[in-house]
């Protein structure tokens, strides 16, 4: 029996970037492992044969190998399916790839913006992503016909009440259709975990308590409990019904896509 609206497909694992909080970086050490495109297409075609019109490409970063992704998109396009995935902001600078991704049916990409503060990006070893570029990245991706979802972190050492207020305003003004937040978490095995252990800043070592909505790190500006409070403060502001309706139902780009509007409205309600 067909359950749901899409199924997952994977083309590759890993990411060439080495963000110090990331488990993918910890596992794959900056490497990207790709599957044979024929095998990936076999899986996508099977998803379609089961009656699904959409799939979720669960790769960690679809621009890890641009040429590979370009060829995959060319193969996907004739199937006339819709799909979702996540990638790094470099896709906005690759016009050919961005167009191919959009033309092949992709309608939403999730980006790990992490922070709008440059010093924070240095701290997490993600200097290749410049917060000054975020608005232009979103504009280019939207222009291609793809909605932008985002993932951002709360509780980096540079975070203050003022920087988090600025983050709220950034999300409100930037056309992000589905903003998601996570507390900065020292997952065992990551560079972040090693550093925080050495500094004695982890307030709870029970990994069963590690979740996006609860901080276990004390920062220069907040205790772990205060970071958790800030997390929920940001959420209450950005996930008020007024904010959800503004970026979904009353989003001008959604006028021609009523079912997509309902999908994103539902996603926001779940978040």
Regions found by a protein language model. Name each.
Residues 160:
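Catalytic palm subdomain of template-directed nucleic-acid polymerases
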Residues 163-164, 177:
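C-terminal structural cap/anchor segments
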